């Protein structure tokens, strides 16, 4: 696992690490201090992932705004 404050190399790696953290936390087998550290790392990864998604959305909007024929509509994620 990367260092606690180190950003993953890609969005996909961050998501994979976050999924592993969720699995560890859901198992209920971690000592309290380790669970808190894992939770903290998960929050960091979630925030980094959200920032990367926002950057990607901005890039798409910029690219579409360069094309006058393309219509730009706000993104609304599907709630699962």
Swiss-Prot record:
A GO MF annotation of the entry reads: exodeoxyribonuclease VII activity
Which Pfam families does the UniProt record give?
Answer: Exonuc_VII_S
Quote the cellular component terms of the Gene Ontology held in the record: cytosol; exodeoxyribonuclease VII complex
Q: Tell me the compartments it is located in.
A: Cytoplasm
Show the catalytic activity. Answer: Exonucleolytic cleavage in either 5'- to 3'- or 3'- to 5'-direction to yield nucleoside 5'-phosphates
| Top-level EC class | hydrolase
Q: What is its EC number?
A: 3.1.11.6
The Gene Ontology biological process annotation of the record reads: DNA catabolic process
Keywords, in A-Z order:
Cytoplasm, Exonuclease, Hydrolase, Nuclease
The record's similarity note reads: Belongs to the XseB family.
Role this protein plays: Bidirectionally degrades single-stranded DNA into large acid-insoluble oligonucleotides, which are then degraded further into small acid-soluble oligonucleotides.
Indicate the quaternary assembly: Heterooligomer composed of large and small subunits.
Any idea what this protein is called? Exodeoxyribonuclease 7 small subunit
